[in-house]
Design a protein with these regions (language model features):
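Substrate-binding cleft of extracellular glycoside hydrolase catalytic domains
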Residues: 142-254, 269-276, 284-286
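Surface-exposed cleft-lining segments at the edges of enzyme active sites
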Residues: 120, 125-126, 180, 217-229, ...
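Surface-exposed substrate-engagement region within the catalytic domains
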Residues: 101-111, 247, 261-406
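N-terminal carbohydrate-binding/catalytic regions of secreted carbohydrate-active enzymes
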Residues: 80-199, 386-402, 406-409
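Stable alpha-helical elements in mature extracytoplasmic
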Residues: 134-137, 189, 193, 233-236, ...
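Fungal secretory targeting signals
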Residues: 1-6, 10, 21-58
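Fungal extracellular Ser/Thr-rich, low-complexity intrinsically disordered regions
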Residues: 52-77
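Structural recognition of the beta-strand scaffold that forms the well-ordered cores
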Residues: 85-87, 123-125, 154-159, 204-210, ...
């Protein structure tokens, strides 16, 4: 839970992020996922000095695309966001309303915080005990759809619980260890997600699969933990794709971002890896493509590359997906994309280096979820990382402390990742 929240200038996330459009400069709206209430580190003006968000629905869901009311038939041949509105994350909304808003004195900031709370964002299944909550949300969606929600509502979730998770960093280490039966535990976790999705087979469910995992296998096999986790990551990802290949599901594999896999030396090997994962899972129809910029800050499209992008012409997510798609197609995997715009609303960011991903200063909420992306490869802009969640603790005594969270361009003090 959020216990106390102070709004500051920035908003945080992992890796790099994107562009302009709506800027609600978030700071740290900390999300406490643990049961225990903890004091939240001070934020600075999450909503100050920002452009107001466009009006958001005050209902449990906000529209992404208002068209017909299709049956949930997710497949690689159609945009799974078209004709649906996305479910507003009740947990995030409740924390903004109960902890963030009471700490705000200016009525304008209260209005902006209320608007942000009503923007749909993905619910992260980052521990197995979150899966029953997924079921509660799907049940709520089913009820609203049966009552005539128009357009119908789709559920949006992140699958994120690999054994030896976050192998190239420390801040988001997970609950399963490969050395302690982690692969089998992960498969049970996936089975539980499948059970929920099958129970609510009439609800369109959109999943992002394992942020950072495959990208780490492209660039970080020189890290011992990643090298040791390679076979487990591939086995677990294959299992997830096969088991969640259901008629009412659309999946997007996480694919890092422009500053990670967009480099000339990385993009070809990345395409080969993603294509092999897709084909090894028997080319599941529910895999629509890839998710980029998850929990990061890169612009969707920017006229001048920021200095910290180090001379890479592929310095925004639009350039990245348009460079990546032909490589993927050549490798046997045609893909569409979704891009996280949750924290890319201020450009350039306060990053000193493109690889600085933890609690970056001078960032802000980006474009609200929409299918109006202006690019046929991009199915939607979405908010994957809820604004204000920490990327990692700045407490050097913590077992999950990562040095990036102590850099000068990182907001400090900061709590554990995901809080």
């Amino acid at each position: 839970m959020f216990s106390r929240i102070y709004f500051t200038t920035p908003l945080v996330s992992n890796k790099s992020q994107n562009t302009n459009t709506l800027r609600l400069v978030p700071g740290y709206l900390m999300n406490m996922h643990s049961i225990n209430m903890r004091a939240i580190w001070p934020l600075v003006s999450l909503f100050s000095a920002v452009h107001a968000l466009p009006a958001a629905s005050a209902t449990a869901s906000a529209s992404v695309a208002a068209s017909s009311s299709p049956a949930p038939t997710a497949s690689a041949t159609g945009n799974p966001f078209e004709g649906y509105q996305l479910y507003v994350n009740p947990y995030y909304k409740s924390q903004v309303e109960s902890s963030a808003i009471p700490s705000l004195s200016a009525s304008s900031l209260v209005a902006q915080a209320s608007a942000a709370a009503d923007v749909p964002s993905f619910y992260w299944l980052d521990t197995a005990d979150k899966v029953p909550t997924m079921g509660e949300y799907l049940d709520d969606i089913q009820t609203q759809n049966a009552a005539g929600a128009n357009p119908p509502i789709a559920g949006i979730f992140v699958v994120y619980d690999l054994p030896d998770r976050d192998c190239a960093a420390l801040a988001s280490n997970g609950e399963y260890a490969i050395s302690d039966g982690g692969v089998e535990k992960y498969k049970a976790y996936i089975d539980s997600i499948r059970e929920q999705v099958e129970t609510y087979s009439d609800v369109q469910t959109i999943l992002i699969i394992e942020p950072d995992s495959l990208a780490n296998l492209v660039t970080n096999l020189d890290v011992a933990k990643c090298a040791n986790a390679q076979s487990a990551y591939l086995e677990c990802t294959n299992y997830a794709l096969e088991q969640l290949n259901l008629p009412n599901v659309a999946m997007y594999l996480d694919a890092g971002h422009a500053g990670w896999l967009g480099w000339p030396a990385n993009i070809g090997p990345a395409a080969e890896l993603y294509a092999s994962v897709y084909k090894n899972a028997s080319s599941p129809a529910a895999v629509r493509g890839l998710a980029t910029n998850v929990a990061n800050f890169n612009a969707w499209s920017i006229d001048t590359c920021p200095s910290y992008t180090s001379g890479n012409d592929v310095c925004d997510e639009k350039s990245y997906i348009n460079a990546f798609a032909p490589e993927l197609s050549s490798a046997g995997c045609d893909a569409h994309f979704i891009t996280d715009t949750g924290r890319n609303g201020k450009q350039p960011t306060g990053q000193s280096a493109w690889g600085d991903w933890c609690n970056v200063k001078d960032t802000g909420f980006g474009a609200q979820p929409t299918t109006d992306t202006g690019d046929e490869l991009a199915d939607a802009f979405v908010w994957v990382k809820p604004g204000g969640e920490s990327d990692g603790t700045s407490d050097t005594s913590s077992s999950r402390y990562d040095a990036h969270c102590g850099y000068s361009d990182a907001l400090q003090p900061a709590p554990e990742a995901g809080t």
